[in-house]
Amino acid sequence: MVENVVYPAYFDADRSRSEGRRVPMDLAIEEPTVDEIAKAVQQVGYDAVIEREKTYSREFKPRGAVVVRGTEDTAKNDLVQAIAAYLGVIRE
């Protein structure tokens, strides 16, 4: 089973690409949480497990991570873009 780890920094509008943001600014949101990311992952159609003690390598404070399971047929970048699209809908 393939697992991808997704961090809140990937979607954070306050971060630059070099600081870890992986989506364009028009899809990025302010201070995303692992709960919002997990909801978006489920909307995309994958299983999500929240790991709150995880820390992204470019951050000092732990904000958690979401482990996405069952992504054998999807590239990580495509997955991140799909999650970002749903995060915008969740925030509205």
Curated annotation (Swiss-Prot):
A Gene Ontology cellular-component term: signal recognition particle
Record key words, sorted: Cytoplasm, Ribonucleoprotein, RNA-binding, Signal recognition particle
Taxonomic source organism: Halorubrum lacusprofundi (strain ATCC 49239 / DSM 5036 / JCM 8891 / ACAM 34)
Gene Ontology terms: biological process: SRP-dependent cotranslational protein targeting to membrane, signal sequence recognition
InterPro entries linked to this entry: Signal_recog_particle_SRP19 (IPR002778), SRP19 (IPR053394), SRP19-like_sf (IPR036521), SRP19_arc-type (IPR022938)
Purpose: Involved in targeting and insertion of nascent membrane proteins into the cytoplasmic membrane. Binds directly to 7S RNA and mediates binding of the 54 kDa subunit of the SRP.
Residues of the signal peptide: none
Similarity-based family: Belongs to the SRP19 family.
Transmembrane segments: none
Name the record gives this protein: Signal recognition particle 19 kDa protein
GO function terms (MF aspect): 7S RNA binding
Short name of one Pfam family: SRP19
Subunit and interaction comment: Part of the signal recognition particle protein translocation system, which is composed of SRP and FtsY. Archaeal SRP consists of a 7S RNA molecule of 300 nucleotides and two protein subunits: SRP54 and SRP19.
Disulfide bonds: none
Localization in the cell: Cytoplasm
